[in-house]
């Protein structure tokens, strides 16, 4: 199966230019292709995964991927289908983000061997280009009429009170020139990107033909949608980042575990490297079993292993199992740090707090009275152990201090998992 056929079977092609010619070229020879990543934050998020993984799929098929980091275009920001103008970031901020994104792209691609991946930065060619060169060598090849007819531009112009600045309007010229420059420097003949990039990609194809007299191609990947209509890649806490310091491997694992049954088989095709046949077997087994599908577990394992590695996957599984067990002794200090980052609602507490106060502080009880009821019913666990009366000499005016949170409830001298019932958790972080 060719790489184009594989992408088609996974539903990963939204639009292409001359797909028959592209497929024939890919079957005849190995090519160089690229995808651009503008640094708009200090980390990539799961919305970037489809193009990143597409580069990897092409490399596995023997082609040379180029990861282009937008050190120059990131200073402006792509306006495509954005409701309002982006805020401009300082050169220092963008430069820092470029370094972060370069390091995050590295694990997905191989930079060794005959088709070693290439890392490029468009600041290398735009940094020395002056305004006159830009207008004379690039601007003259673009029709303002055609640019105004782009859907992404029309939406901004037609939206009340929005409009578009010349800076953002000219963005497609910069991205278009990227293609021409990478074609000249590295022989790139294919640009891939999200479906919102179609206008910018076709602009680059036309400019490359004009400047270099070369036939090149474009391919876009679909917009990832969820069956319930909500935005993919967002949680109540915000974006799901690829940086483990922004989204913990545990939370990342949980995100994929919670994928809806209606989406999970599509996402296995989109995001994993399991074959279509293997995914079909998983789906058939799930349908035949009549019980809880295995697909979400497989998806969560595949994605966490791919992004964070085997050790992080083991930690995510260990945390998941321990939260609902009475024995939490397997949790490491690093596991607790993940929970403090984003795994559980975390609350700072000081010595002298009792179980009733902790329940109310964390929102696991609405009142002291309700909290006492939970404690008396043995429904409260501290690091997996039932909250017990341990302070017979408490002051008479503070009866709840009978259930003082003492040292034995602290793991690594710093953490206590407070659990009420089977599924309600909070993390106490001791000052």
Curated annotation (Swiss-Prot):
For this record, an example GO cellular component is:
cytosol
The record places domain S4 RNA-binding at 353-422
Annotated EC: 6.1.1.1
Q: Which GO terms describe its biological process?
A: tyrosyl-tRNA aminoacylation
Pfam families tied to this protein: SYY_C-terminal (PF22421), tRNA-synt_1b (PF00579)
Its predominant location is cytoplasm
- Where is this chain's protein located in or outside the cell? Cytoplasm
Kindly report, in one word, the top-level EC class recorded for this enzyme: ligase
Subunit-level organization: Homodimer.
Similarity field: Belongs to the class-I aminoacyl-tRNA synthetase family. TyrS type 1 subfamily.
**Entry protein name:** Tyrosine--tRNA ligase
What are the leading ranks of the lineage?
A: Bacteria, Pseudomonadati, Pseudomonadota, Betaproteobacteria, Neisseriales
């Amino acid at each position: 199966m060719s790489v184009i056929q594989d992408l088609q079977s996974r539903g990963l092609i939204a639009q292409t230019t001359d797909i028959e010619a592209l497929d024939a070229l890919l079957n005849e020879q190995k090519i160089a292709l690229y995808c651009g990543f503008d640094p708009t934050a200090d980390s990539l998020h799961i919305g970037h995964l489809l193009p990143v993984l597409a580069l990897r799929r092409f490399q596995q098929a023997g082609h040379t991927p180029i990861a282009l980091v937008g050190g120059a275009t990131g200073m402006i920001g792509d306006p495509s289908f954005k409701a309002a103008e982006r805020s401009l970031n300082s050169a220092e901020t963008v430069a820092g983000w470029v370094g972060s994104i370069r390091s995050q792209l590295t694990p997905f691609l191989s930079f060794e061997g005959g088709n070693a991946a290439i890392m490029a930065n468009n600041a290398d060619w735009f940094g020395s280009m002056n305004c006159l060169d830009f207008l004379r060598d690039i601007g003259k090849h673009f029709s303002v009429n055609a640019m105004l007819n782009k859907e992404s531009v029309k939406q901004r112009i037609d939206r009340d009170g929005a409009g578009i600045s010349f800076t953002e309007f000219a963005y497609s010229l910069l991205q278009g020139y990227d293609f021409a420059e990478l074609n000249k420097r590295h022989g790139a003949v294919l640009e891939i990107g999200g479906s919102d990039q179609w206008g910018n990609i076709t602009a680059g194809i036309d400019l490359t033909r004009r400047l270099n007299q070369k036939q090149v191609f474009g391919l876009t990947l679909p917009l990832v949608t969820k069956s319930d209509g909500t935005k993919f890649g967002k949680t109540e806490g915000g974006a799901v980042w690829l940086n483990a310091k922004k989204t913990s491997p545990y939370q990342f694992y949980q995100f994929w575990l919670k994928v809806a049954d209606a989406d999970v088989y599509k996402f296995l095709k989109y995001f994993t490297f399991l074959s279509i046949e293997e995914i079909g077997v998983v789906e058939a087994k799930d349908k035949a079993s009549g019980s809880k599908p295995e697909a979400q577990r497989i998806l969560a394992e595949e994605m966490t292993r791919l992004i964070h590695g085997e050790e992080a996957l083991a930690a995510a599984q260990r945390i998941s199992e321990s939260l609902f067990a009475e024995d939490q002794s397997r949790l490491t200090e690093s596991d607790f740090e993940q929970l403090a980052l984003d795994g559980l609602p975390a609350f700072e507490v000081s010595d002298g707090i009792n179980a009733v106060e902790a329940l109310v502080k964390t929102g696991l009880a609405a009142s002291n009275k309700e909290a006492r009821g939970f404690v008396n019913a043995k429904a409260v666990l501290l690091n997996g152990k039932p909250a017990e009366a341990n302070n017979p000499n408490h002051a008479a005016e503070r009866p709840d201090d009978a259930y003082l949170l003492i040292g034995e409830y602290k793991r690594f001298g710093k953490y206590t998992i407070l659990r009420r019932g089977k599924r309600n958790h909070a993390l106490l972080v001791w000052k």
